[in-house]
Amino acid sequence: VPPKHQQMEDHYFGSIKDRVLEFMVDVDEALWKLGIPAKTRHNEVAPGQFEIAPIFESQNLAVDHNMLVMEVLRKTANKHDMVCLLHEKPFSGMNGSGKHNNWSLSAPGYGSLLNPGSSPQENAIFLTLLCATIKAVDEHADLLRASVAKSGNEHRLGAHEAPPAIISIFLGDLLDEIIEQIEKGGTKKACTQKTINIGVDTLPMFPLDASDRNRTSPFAFTGNKFEFRAVGSSQTCAWPMTVLNTIVAESLDEICTILE
């Protein structure tokens, strides 16, 4: 391990260097010209590591835009006499890079089908899709894992950084409680989202974030979507999303067959 490393997290909590910020501004401008919405500028854990967040879009468009983002990052870095490393684990002993794929389904007139609403235990559409997704990932975790298996990513996953290499689902306490009640024969009591009281009368109550903020699960429910965190940084998102769409479609088809 080199002397200048990531143990003290001084890069993570430090300010963005002017030279890097100029690069980020040029990247934003290039992406906006291409019609690609993106945001977020901040340091990541490893020295010289940074994050960019393309904004949610329809899946086929988001995948195409993600490929363009990678190209823009490389070309813009060269203009600034820098190199953009998209390898998942370019240096041993330091954090690697990956993509977080936020996945949901929507329908005309319904909006997001993974939006729990104010009373998720009574939202039949949400619960059906939630159970179908859980079933799909449980039965086809091997396919989902294989969709992100490449040499660079294998050096990153399951090491000393999130997420683990074993596919698991995190739902949060609220949805866990609802699923457990359904398993026992139906929801017997109301399940409400917890709130945070910060002790200041002039400020409102804030909803408690139920997601795993330390990224311990590669497939987690985050508010109104699932977040697949195991995709490699140099990888196209097309294949993992194709696999996810297919296995969930199979689960929904089986549920529909049972109901019919």
Residues of each region from the PLM?
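Glycine-rich N-terminal segment of FAD-binding domains in flavoprotein oxidoreductases
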Residues: 90
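Glycine-rich, acidic/polar active-site loops that bind/position phosphate-bearing ligands
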Residues: 1-86, 94-98, 104-260
